[in-house]
């Protein structure tokens, strides 16, 4: 018999694997705008951008969203969070990308790990009553897998870091070994995202500061819509 905790970890590894067909390979979440402006050209410049992205946007959006899902006491709260988390993503490409990847993640998760909330979420998306934002979808799936809140936050942030780094490897381009060096360095930033989001949650202000990202990054993400030539959808 497999240890239940091991089942949860294995499920987490499946659903956060970069090979999962969610379409993450087609999103830069704004770094292509900086790349087009010749501000991202090597390991040092991409690492600086990625650290800023984790510290100033991902921590205050997806990390907090996962924690708010864990704090929910009924599914009606999940419906509210799905609206809130989707609405706070101001750049259109980022908002639509979050929904597209979230719906694919939910579809896979509903077939592989069909818990009550997961199936209700899928029904809500199918009936176009819910958006299926990736962060709230992941929070619901992680709760169903019975992994700890900190682990769920870390897994989602780290999976995003890996996807973006893999995209930078082929987009900038960077070497494969360089990409691995960036991912190793990013583990510290993931730890900060976990700690900061935990503190904000414990202080009871997670919902209040949700979406409090860096305006410059959001503007760059918006400008991406009007770039002449694009490798990525966001």
Can you annotate each of these PLM segments?
Residues 39, 43-44, 155-234:
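C-terminal auxiliary extensions adjacent to catalytic cores
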Residues 5, 19-22, 58, 94-97, ...:
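Secondary-structure capping and boundary motifs in well-ordered enzyme cores
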Residues 136, 147-155, 162:
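Amphipathic alpha-helical hairpins/coiled-coils and adjacent low-complexity
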Residues 63, 68, 75-146:
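Internal, conserved structured core segments that host functional sites
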């Amino acid at each position: 018999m497999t240890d239940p905790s091991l089942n949860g970890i294995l499920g987490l590894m499946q659903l956060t694997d970069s090979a999962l067909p969610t379409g993450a390979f087609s999103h830069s979440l704004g770094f292509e705008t900086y790349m087009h402006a010749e501000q991202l050209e090597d390991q040092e410049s991409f690492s600086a951008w990625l650290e800023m992205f984790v510290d100033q946007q991902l921590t205050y959006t997806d990390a907090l969203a996962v924690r708010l899902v864990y704090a929910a006491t009924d599914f009606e709260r999940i419906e509210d969070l799905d609206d809130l988390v989707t609405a706070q993503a101001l750049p259109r490409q980022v908002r639509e990308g979050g929904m597209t990847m979230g719906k694919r993640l939910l579809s896979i998760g509903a077939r592989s790990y069909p818990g009550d909330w997961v199936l209700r979420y899928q029904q809500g998306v199918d009936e176009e009553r819910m958006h299926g934002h990736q962060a709230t979808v992941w929070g619901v799936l992680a709760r169903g897998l019975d992994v700890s809140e900190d682990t769920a936050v870390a897994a989602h942030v780290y999976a995003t870091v890996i996807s973006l780094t893999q995209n930078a490897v082929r987009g900038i381009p960077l070497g494969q070994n360089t990409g691995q060096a960036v991912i190793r360095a990013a583990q510290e930033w993931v730890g900060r995202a976990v700690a900061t989001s935990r503190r904000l949650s414990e202080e009871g202000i997670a919902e209040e500061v949700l979406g409090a990202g860096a305006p410059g990054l959001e503007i760059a993400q918006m400008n991406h819509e009007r770039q002449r030539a694009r490798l990525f959808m966001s």
